[in-house]
Amino acid sequence: NVNCSEADEWRDQINGVIRVTMGGGLCSASIVNNTAYDRTPYVLFADHCLSGSPSEYVFHFNYQSPTCSGTAGPLNQSISGSILLANENIETGADVALLELTSDIPDSYDPFYVGWSRSSSPPQEAIGIHHPGGATKRISFTNDNVSSGGTGGNYWEFQYIDGRVIPGSSGS
């Protein structure tokens, strides 16, 4: 649960992960920054989660338990509608989609625009913030053995030491 003390170090990043409802399914996604830092509402998502029309997707912000032991969260902070800007499927080497929301994210949602890097060096650790099975937001931790994987080294491989991912976690 993201409101347990183990997640304190990642409070900002927790606000950068959202739940997406689309075509009867659920996935996770990240609000991603751009180099202009202008709060353009870009959302990074998994290509295999694309289903139906992105204009009908619903993006839920802050769907998380208010306490460490809770399992319920509010669904009253949401935006409907997006445009697909770019995507690449897993057969061609990636599983990524970039969406732009059709509405700005209200400041009252306290969004955090996560950063990105073009570095080819693996990070020292990886943290997964996601909505497993569409549930309230959870956090998973890795060990320090992050390595480059896949043909051409186009993704990071790691083993979680606490937490796990299941359907619905994809896209975060």
Located regions from the model:
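Serine endopeptidase catalytic core focused on the charge-relay Asp
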Residues: 1-159
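Beta-propeller and closely related beta-sheet repeat lectin domains
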Residues: 28, 171-172
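Short pre-catalytic strand/loop immediately N-terminal to key active-site residues, enriched for Gly-Thr
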Residues: 160-166
